[in-house]
């Protein structure tokens, strides 16, 4: 009888310990924030390793349970996100609203849900890497920018894929040769995207 009592006590202690551990996991889950975060001078692009704020134009970020990945451009964010292994991470994506920000220095107070944004491609506005996709919360603001530049187009998040990014990069950088990336020391238009 004493053996059976010890066995039941051990089983009870193991179950109690398991419940305590399970409860700790719930608290940790509740503390995870998926809100956008500010960009800082020492942030490196997750894709290319360049300093994120050294370049003009909208930036992107992917906020996950385990942290934040930052990107020097919206195109770099899409390049990362469109990889099959990254799409399953359930990251929340954010981009700057260029309807509320200056092109040369986007305002981190105006980071918006990238999946709800409208993107303008085909403008001469320079960004960090590859195609410059100007991001907007408001479709009308995006259409106003596109109307200012012949050949520019407005597309929603779900219409951007790898082929679209490649075509946009080729159209924007057609004559730049192998070094298709503008350098941070080059002069850029100092006007706002809106």
Model-derived features: where do they sit?
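Bacterial N-terminal signal peptides that target proteins for export
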Residues: 2-13
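C-terminal motif of bacterial Sec signal peptides marking the signal peptidase cleavage site
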Residues: 20-23
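Bacterial lipoprotein signal-peptidase II cleavage site
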Residues: 25-32
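Short functional micro-motifs and their immediate structural scaffolds
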Residues: 29, 53, 154
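Post-signal-peptide N-terminal segment of Sec-exported extracytoplasmic proteins
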Residues: 37-70, 74-78
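Short active-site loop/helix that positions an aromatic residue
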Residues: 76-84, 145-147
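Thiol/selenol-based redox catalytic cores and closely related redox-interacting motifs
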Residues: 91-157
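Histidine-centered metal-binding segments
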Residues: 172-194
